[in-house]
Amino acid sequence: MKIRFLLLIMLISYVSCTSDDKEEVLPRAYTILSLGDSYTIGQSVCETCHFPAQLKDSLVAKFPAADSFSLELIAQTGWTTTNLLNAVEGENLTNTYDLVTLLIGVNNQFQSKPFSLYEEEFPVLVAKAVELAKGDINNVVVVSIPDYAYTPFGQDYGYSPETSQEIDQYNNFASNYCNQNGITFVNITDITRQGLINTNLVSQDQLHPSELAYSLFVERLLPFAVEKIQ
């Protein structure tokens, strides 16, 4: 009888301790900032179809229902690294973002800007992205530049293999820089190079990625985003 009584006391004490040890989990509000150009705003697709919006929605599905996600874009069709730098500097941004994505450079190539300009300004943009991401390199993801040569637009305007070679040059520089500085770099260029054999990957303007293509971008981005935000 005495043994049963002691066991009961121990059980009650254990339950009491474990209950006290449980911490209340409060809902969290996460913020995402996406920097870039037409590939970021999703030219020719719906407002919820571009990759930042799809990434946000995918994160919502991965996290507790009480958590919330907000998304801010600083991007515009035609922007070069110079345009994006000026825009970021002109905004009153806080350095509190949980995740910052950066995709920039295609208009430097398309507008025949000196490659040295990208070599100079891309690192500045990465540093700014890190600063905005709470100063933490682990909160930043750089996305490779899509290849518009593999679209009807690219073919109709007679773009040669040199276009893809130049885009490779930009992406190789960005990838090497990110690898050397501990920044996550996600390659999605190969997805866009299927645009001629899978026309569903190209939007109605015959140039930019479609909603489907952006969903494939997100499949690659999501594991990194989840890891960084958790």
For the regions a protein language model found, what residue spans apply to each?
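Sec-dependent signal peptide recognition
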Residues: K2-L8
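Short hydrophobic "helix-edge" motifs at membrane interfaces and signal-peptide entry regions
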Residues: F5, P27-R28, T199-L201
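C-terminal motif of bacterial Sec signal peptides marking the signal peptidase cleavage site
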Residues: S13-S16
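Serine-esterase "nucleophile elbow" of acetyl-processing enzymes
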Residues: T18-T77, E89-N95
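Basic, gly/Ser/Thr/Pro-rich low-complexity segments located predominantly at protein N termini
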Residues: I41, E47, T80-N83, F110, ...
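Short, flexible loop segments at the rims of nucleotide/cofactor-binding pockets, characterized by
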Residues: Q76-T80, T163
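Alpha-helical cap/lid subdomain in secreted, periplasmic
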Residues: N86-Q230
